[in-house]
């Protein structure tokens, strides 16, 4: 998948953030590391719970507070905690209420406490986080340092899902629910295809997949508000190359349908936050859910890369 948001970012008069001379904000040298630390810092700064603070770094909290001061009332950074809150709100709708044994899998969890919360809320379920070995090691270290009790039904699997099929990482087991938060921004078209094939193969019949998605048509709305425009653009500049922004919602739906998934539903994070009585973030993100049918239908033709995509090696 190429980077459809590039023309937007090019026209925004972005603040200069030169990373060539090193990690100037101590968030990490790679886009995924910077993103994980910034998101963890935003959750800690804006939610300020024992778990979010424990899972964040000092530099992540400092940068998040700095951006929060710039952000003011635009609520750009609030969409980081909001997407987690909406996914937690939707989870009960996606798992069988009467099943005694459940397998809930979160992939590329980063420093999110969401799987920890799932393990606490669903003690009859086995909750598995799948992530890179260094991320798992650092997360365990932070939880221990923060004296966060780890439920007995939560465990970690160390795997690079770019090399290891998800089902192999789970020793052939299939899940009732697979979730992904914070990964989609970094996926190319081929990586999206691989992810959805992996998820379909690893879900039990009747199981659900939940993932957050970003859309070019929503980002274009930022240009109408200079304040939101500037803050959001700075955030995206910090996290680096983000090829996974899709042109629109129909582009996202094709990834589900190509693997035969049904009941595809979009939940606009800002709208759901309003419905549950929480502060609404700026409308940048949606949560998409879908179901693996009980019987497999004929597979549709493979999804094609979006027609208006920019070159895959482009940078924001």
Residue spans for each PLM region:
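Short amphipathic alpha-helix with an adjacent loop that forms part of the alpha/beta core around
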Residues: 164-173
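Conserved Class I S-adenosyl-L-methionine
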Residues: 223-246
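Conserved beta-strand signature within the Rossmann-like core of class I S-adenosyl-L-methionine
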Residues: 203-217
């Amino acid at each position: 998948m190429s980077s459809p948001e590039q023309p937007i970012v090019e026209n925004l008069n972005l603040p200069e953030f030169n990373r060539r001379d090193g990690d100037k904000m101590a968030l990490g040298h790679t886009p995924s590391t910077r993103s994980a630390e910034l998101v963890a810092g935003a959750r800690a700064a804006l939610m300020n719970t024992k778990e979010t603070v424990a899972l964040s770094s000092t530099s992540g909290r400092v940068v998040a507070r700095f951006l929060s001061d710039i952000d003011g009332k635009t609520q750009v950074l609030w969409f980081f905690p909001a997407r987690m809150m909406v996914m937690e709100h939707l989870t009960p709708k996606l798992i069988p209420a009467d099943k005694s044994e459940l397998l809930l899998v979160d992939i590329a969890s980063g420093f999110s406490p969401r799987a920890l919360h799932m393990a606490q809320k669903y003690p009859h379920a086995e909750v598995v986080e799948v992530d890179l070995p260094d991320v798992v090691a650092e997360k365990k270290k932070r939880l221990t340092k923060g004296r966060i009790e780890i439920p007995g039904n939560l465990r970690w699997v160390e795997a690079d899902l770019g090399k290891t099929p998800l089902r192999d990482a789970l020793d052939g087991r299939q899940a009732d629910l697979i979730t992904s938060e914070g990964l989609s921004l970094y996926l190319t078209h081929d990586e999206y295809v691989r992810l959805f094939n992996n998820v379909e193969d690893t879900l039990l019949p009747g199981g659900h997949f939940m993932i957050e998605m970003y859309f070019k048509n929503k980002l274009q709305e930022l240009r109408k508000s200079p304040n939101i425009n500037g803050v959001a653009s700075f955030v995206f500049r910090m996290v680096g190359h983000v090829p996974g922004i899709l042109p629109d919602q129909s582009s996202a739906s094709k990834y589900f349908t190509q693997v035969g998934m049904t009941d595809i539903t979009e939940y606009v994070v800002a709208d759901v936050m309003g419905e549950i009585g929480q502060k609404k973030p700026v409308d940048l993100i949606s949560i998409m859910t879908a179901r693996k049918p009980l019987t497999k239908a004929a597979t549709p033709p493979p999804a094609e890369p979006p027609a208006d995509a920019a070159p895959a090696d482009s940078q924001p």
